[in-house]
Every structure is written in structure tokens, then in C-alpha cells.
Amino acid sequence: MLKSNDKLLEVSNIEVVYNHVILVLKGVSLSLSKGSIVALLGGNGAGKTTTLKAISNLLHSERGEVTKGSITYRSEKIEKLSPSELVKSGVIQVMEGRHCFEHLTVEENLLTGAYTRKEGKKKVLEDLEMVYSYFPRLKQRRKSQAGYTSGGEQQMCAIGRALMSKPETVLLDEPSMGLAPQLVEEIFEIVKKLNENEGVSFLLAEQNTNVALRFAHFGYILESGRVVMDGPAEELRENPDVKEFYLGLSGDKRKSYRDGRSYRRRKRWLN
């Protein structure tokens, strides 16, 4: 979509500490414009999931807290909002690992996403059909227990459940995790269509840098709790450092982190 420069989400220089002593995020700043897809990239332990949980206020269950900086949505501070209040404000997170209710059917899972809405049943059912139009496989499996569906179908169910809350912004954590490449492409194509057709903005945390930068408008790269690089997705895809460390390519050769020069070059990012 990307037709507006209006800032929906602003994360300004936040620090996150777990158990009062473990500093995980070290001055992270990022923004999400209305109608955009922004990718948050990096390896395991870089701070991607913690950043999303800081925004969605899910840190407290893991004894984490934002100790510095600010997070605003539509220029309003949201650090004190509960997750349910944040959903009512238009922001919802799809957790890493899908987290469907295994004993419920696919359709029952989807309908749980509408629990905060005040419209009547007719409008909710209309939106259910909208979700099915983007995820026809879910309609075919709507009476199946979610626990007996495939990983790809559970990821679709988790995204569809989030859409049932009528969000303006979706925080999507590791949508490609554990999925075959063909399913990853399918999921990201649907994200793109939702962005273009429904105007949903996405902030997605993803280790699959290649696919994320093909579908995103803008990207941030995290290393050890810091943003070390950011820019338009097309520019990041062509950046030599990104090619070397995240796409695994340098010229015509595939690079390894064990390469001494590569390691020293990488360390310079964090100085």
C-alpha cells in the first residue's frame, strides 16, 4: 500500500531489562508508517521478539520491562495500556509459534479474535468471510480441530484470528518459522494483499531476510539488542553487508561467519 507518510508507531530509544538485571534492548528506535510493511531482521537473540513484546505490552509475563525511552501509537503513549486495551486501539500481535487453541475448531479459533468487538453478529460473520477469502484453505478446514491442522494452516489461522479484531496494525513474529519455502511465499503473498487491499500495516520480525526484504517497504537490522542498519528494503537487499551476513552472499561466493575478515567487519557495526 504505502500511500501515506503518517507515522502510526514510534519506538524511541527504548531499553528493556529482564529480571531487573539483564539488559536485552539497548536504545532501539524504529517507526511504522500508515499503510507500510516494515521488517525487523536479525538472528536468534538479536532482540526482535522482545521489541514486539515491548510494543504489545507482553513483557511483564516474562519479568521484563521497558526501563528507558518511549513507545507511542498515533502520538499517544501506549506503555501503560494492557494488551486488551491495545487491541481495542488497533494493534495486535501474532505470537511466534502460532499458539492456536488446539481443542477448538479453526472457525472457533477465528471467532475468538472478535471478542473485543461491539458490532453485531452479522458484521463479525462478514469479516469471517473476508478472512476466508484470503485464506481459502481455512474455509476448507473450518470444522477441523486446530491441533490437527498443518503448521502452515495454523499460521494462517493465527493471522486470521488477529484480523478478526479489525486491527490497523499487526505485529507479526517469525511468520516463516518451521514452514516449507512454498508456504512461506504463500503467507507473505497474503500479507502483501492484506496490506494493499485492506490497508493493514505490518511490523514483522523475521529471520528469513531474503523473503522479508522482498515483501517489506522498509527494514531494520538488529544485532545484540541494537539497530545496526536500517533503510528502504530494496536498498538493504543490495547492501554488501546485508548480502554478506544475512543473505549469505558476497559477490559470487557464499560467506561464512567463521571467515575472520567477515567477523571483524561485523564487529565494527557494534562499536
Task: Indicate residue ranges for each PLM-predicted region.
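The feature captures the beta-strand-to-loop junction immediately N-terminal to the Walker
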Residues: 41-43
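A short, proline-enriched helix->beta-strand linker immediately N-terminal to the Walker B motif
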Residues: 164-168
